[in-house]
Design a protein with these regions (language model features):
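Class I SAM-dependent methyltransferase SAM-binding "motif I" and its flanking Rossmann-like core
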Residues: 92-94, 99-166
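Catalytic phosphate-donor-binding core of small-molecule kinases
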Residues: 135, 148-151, 185-221
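Class I S-adenosyl-L-methionine
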Residues: 1-17, 22-119, 123-124, 231, ...
């Protein structure tokens, strides 16, 4: 009889990828199956193993992709197959996340499970909006309340008198459609009409939006701008603190929604830094890398080459791993090292090695080109060269529907090509997704890092709007600020 797998009910946190717990991230990294919701940031799925099965259980307003009963059945079925299963849920599984129902279903079938708490949006979204849910001067009590229950009309039956009289700060979850009902009942049961209210949409994301008012005015304000879920509604005097301590929305790239052409299997440093400055960054395409057999003759003759050219930082790192795994002493290599990029140069420098730029190669003698399958297009001056393929990198088709759902939620304003090598795979990836690349980018600004990248984009039929003065992140950020003005 097959041993049952374990199910991990993991809180993904409120949106910002960096707010997931260490234990939650570890569960994703070890998962064989992940069932994920709409409100779990899809970028968290990139921590999963390449062969992990991804199942979307997302719930859009009035449109459920997979009903709760079906989710419960899937969790049980996958665990009975002996799989390590992660149920990835926005916020905390136990705070209006139906984690209790899923745990009960697993217990009923004797499936081992663990619950991994997450930061709930009622606290995190408020904090990112500059509002602590408690404050000695404004509020010493706090409550989280569902604004939409399982009744036929969805209007929650609450102890309104207790909420109005006894709770200083109230966080209503998913309350946009029932906002008139909420405000009416709070005022009817004694809450002052001028009590501050704020709605926070997509809290902790770069696309976070807020609308402020009072119990008497907020309904009209929300209707005027067609505000929608996912949103937290925060009611209480502590909302007024926001004017003084708002911090997230002051980041230099807050509100920017950027599409970044991707060349690496991991998150790029550019994406990481832009995110830290407040932007939402979607990287595309998502790559997966598989191992390849290394040519034994090349390994045996590694000491005979005059020049070794690394096509990418990843291939440089893989090269040294390959040498170590084959028991080869680096000191046996007499070749000069050459690189195309600063990142590759850094990989070698960190190992105490010096390298030269590929443009300085001249007549390389016996040359070894080290790279992945899509890099190996070097053209020398007629000299023969050998190839060490360190891995085979392909666009990860499993992530294409994930990318399409991210696009549904986004309102992109900028596309960035970080290198000339990023242009062709990006265009081919969009085509594979069934998207018209030119239509997708017709209303957004295109930024290219360097003149060579700009020429590659133009050759692909793309209109380039900006080329930063220098090929570094600081210059890129200044360029993005200029676009936003």
């Amino acid at each position: 009889m097959m041993e049952k797998g374990t199910v991990y009910l993991v809180g993904a946190g409120p949106g910002d990828v960096r707010l997931i717990t260490v234990k939650g991230k570890e569960a994703i990294q070890q998962a064989q199956v992940i069932l994920y919701d709409r409100l779990a940031n899809p970028k968290l799925l990139e921590f999963a193993p390449a062969d992990c099965e991804l199942i979307y259980c997302g719930k859009l307003p009035d449109r459920h992709t997979l009903r709760q009963e079906g989710i419960n059945e899937l969790l049980v079925a996958k665990a009975k197959e002996g799989k390590r299963v992660v149920r990835l849920k926005g916020g905390d599984p136990g705070v209006f996340g139906r984690g209790g129902e899923e745990a009960a279903a697993l217990a009923e079938h004797n499936i081992p499970f663990e619950i991994v708490p997450g930061i709930t949006s009622g606290i995190a979204a408020s904090t990112y909006a500059g509002i602590p849910v408690t404050h000695r001067e404004y509020g010493t009590s706090f409550a989280v309340v569902t604004a939409h229950d399982k009744s036929e009309d969805g209007k929650p039956s609450l102890k309104w008198k207790g909420l109005a009289d006894s709770i200083d700060t109230i966080a209503f979850y998913m309350g946009v459609s029932n906002l008139p009902y909420i405000c009416e009942n709070l005022m009817k049961h004694g809450k002052a009409p001028d009590t501050p209210v704020i709605l926070i949409q997509w809290g902790t994301y770069g696309r976070q939006k807020t609308v402020e008012g009072t119990l008497a005015t907020i309904v009209e304000k929300v209707a005027a701008i067609q505000f929608s879920n996912p949103a937290i509604t925060l009611v209480g005097e502590v909302v007024s603190v926001r004017d003084q301590i708002s911090w997230f929305e002051k980041k230099p790239l807050f509100g920017r929604q950027i599409l970044l052409a991707r060349t690496s299997t991991t998150e790029s440093k550019v994406a990481e830094q832009l995110t830290r400055l407040g932007a939402d960054v979607i990287e595309f395409p998502k790559w997966k890398k598989t191992a390849v057999n290394i040519d034994k003759k090349i390994i045996e003759n590694i000491h005979t080459y005059d020049s070794i050219l690394f096509a990418s930082p990843e291939s440089a790192m893989d090269f040294f791993t390959i040498l170590f795994n084959h028991g080869i002493d680096l000191r046996r290599i007499r070749a000069d090292f050459f690189v195309h990029s600063k990142k590759s140069m850094k990989v070698l420098n960190e190992r105490g090695l010096l390298a030269k730029w590929a443009d300085e190669m001249g007549h390389p003698g016996s040359l070894l080109l080290v790279g992945e399958n899509h890099h190996l297009q070097h053209k020398g001056d007629g000299e023969a060269y050998d190839i060490m393929m360190t891995g085979e990198k392909q666009i990860d088709g499993q992530f294409m529907p994930v990318f399409l759902r991210m696009l549904e939620e986004a309102h992109l304003d900028t596309l960035i090509f970080p290198s000339s090598a990023s242009v062709k795979p990006f265009m081919e990836g969009l085509k594979a997704c069934g998207l018209d690349a030119y239509k997708l980018i017709e209303d957004i600004k295109v930024v290219c890092m360097g003149s060579k990248t700009s020429l590659a984009a133009q050759d692909a039929g793309i209109t380039v709007d900006y080329v930063p003065k220098e090929r570094n992140v600081n210059s890129l950020v200044e360029c993005l600020k200029e676009i936003g003005e």
